[in-house]
Amino acid sequence: MKFVIKSISKNSGRLGQLRIGKESNELQTPLLMQTTKGGSIPYLSGDVFDSVCKGQQQQQLLQLTLSTMDQMAESLVQWNRSLSEYVGLPGHATVLLLRDPCETTPAGGNDRDVVPLFTRRGKESLTATRYLELVSSFAPDVYQGLCDADTNPDSTKKRVQKSVDRTERFMEQCYERRVENSTLLAPIVGGYNTFARTQSIKHARQQPAGSYGGYILEGFHSNGLAATELKATQLLPIVEHCVQQLEEEQPRLMPGAYTPLLMLELIRQGIDIFDTSYAYCAAVNYKALSFSYKLDEIRPDDEHTPLLDMTAEEYKEQFKPLLSGCTCLACEKHTRAYHHHLYKTHELLGPILLMIHNLHHLMGFFDVIRASIGTDQLPALLEHLRMQNTSTEINYRIEPNNKIVTKAAMGKGFIAPAV
């Protein structure tokens, strides 16, 4: 993996080019990894995903997770082609992570020599040896080092220190037995403790040159919707502390469903790679992304919401697209009323269309981010996203959908509210 910085600005972050593998195209950073579940883009077939990516970078970076794919390791040993071909998305680069950023990772299960892997079949205890065997079976282009990232804003100092000490022990084996033809990402852990983060960084930086090809910053949240609830005042000082001690020539990755506003703040601090788990978390909770990311865009006063809750009764008679001017399939062919109807009738097409729209919207957002960095306008975009032309700061947190639709409550025409 080769990373080249094209431009860097104190106020707007940095632009870069990432080349993964000898025959890959150059990926422009800041970059969105495509979150997958079991190797598939959630709700989307390969053809639909290709149509969503039309007009974007030809090659995408697929984020694969061991917690949703570990059962494939045995068959992958017999596979003599690329991992992206195995999952039916040929031509794309792959990065293998340990945990699914879309789902809350249960706490506990960590021990001196093992890390818990929570799968659909239950918990498996991974030693460093077993982990490296699995990575060798998958043979991804990029993989993260084994780490104890079971920390969040509420973690105690003792739990944080244990996570750093255990990660150092795991990484000694990962550095010693690097997987051939794959790039290792060095994990930086330590919760919200600056001393622990510094210890983790020092351990990575004291390794011989070429031991790893980038950094993955973890241990800030428990994945799932918890990432959308993080406070910028708590997270940003820790990330800034870490970035100041990392080499500029190495890419920096932060997985998780961070809000668009927080992603902008992190990009401004020098983080290069994120994922699309925010789009998935919104879709699975029947939310459509609707925030404005164009500086010259002017909307009516009632159109400043960052998320449309398609479970709300107000949309049952709104015969207009999710977002005016959006060119995705969900907006060009369907109305808000239809999306609300799909929710009420439990149709699988509902989250499919929302995922199409949310991915399209988030990818367009990153196109604008890269253009804004190039013209040093990221601060203006950040302010636009924070206020959305209103007088109050916008909240991008995703609320879980706890409504239950029953036949008894709907009546004729499905007009009764959900209970």
UniProtKB/Swiss-Prot annotation:
First-listed, main subcellular location of the protein, grouped into a coarse class: cytoplasm
Chain sites annotated for binding Zn(2+): C326, C328, C331, H357
Top-rank taxon: Eukaryota
Gene3D superfamilies, per database record: Queuine tRNA-ribosyltransferase-like
Any one GO biological process: tRNA-guanine transglycosylation
Keywords: Cytoplasm, Metal-binding, tRNA processing, Zinc
Keyword tRNA processing on entry: yes
Cofactor (UniProt): Zn(2+)
Molecular function, one GO term: tRNA-guanosine(34) queuine transglycosylase activity
Record localization: Cytoplasm
Cofactor binding, note field: Binds 1 zinc ion per subunit.
SUPFAM superfamilies, sorted: tRNA-guanine transglycosylase
GO CC terms of this entry: cytoplasm
Family, per entry: Belongs to the queuine tRNA-ribosyltransferase family. QTRT2 subfamily.
Function, in words: Non-catalytic subunit of the queuine tRNA-ribosyltransferase (TGT) that catalyzes the base-exchange of a guanine (G) residue with queuine (Q) at position 34 (anticodon wobble position) in tRNAs with GU(N) anticodons (tRNA-Asp, -Asn, -His and -Tyr), resulting in the hypermodified nucleoside queuosine (7-(((4,5-cis-dihydroxy-2-cyclopenten-1-yl)amino)methyl)-7-deazaguanosine).
Subunit structure: Heterodimer of a catalytic subunit and an accessory subunit.
Protein name, per record: Queuine tRNA-ribosyltransferase accessory subunit 2
Species per Swiss-Prot/TrEMBL record: Drosophila grimshawi
Species lineage: Eukaryota, Metazoa, Ecdysozoa, Arthropoda, Hexapoda
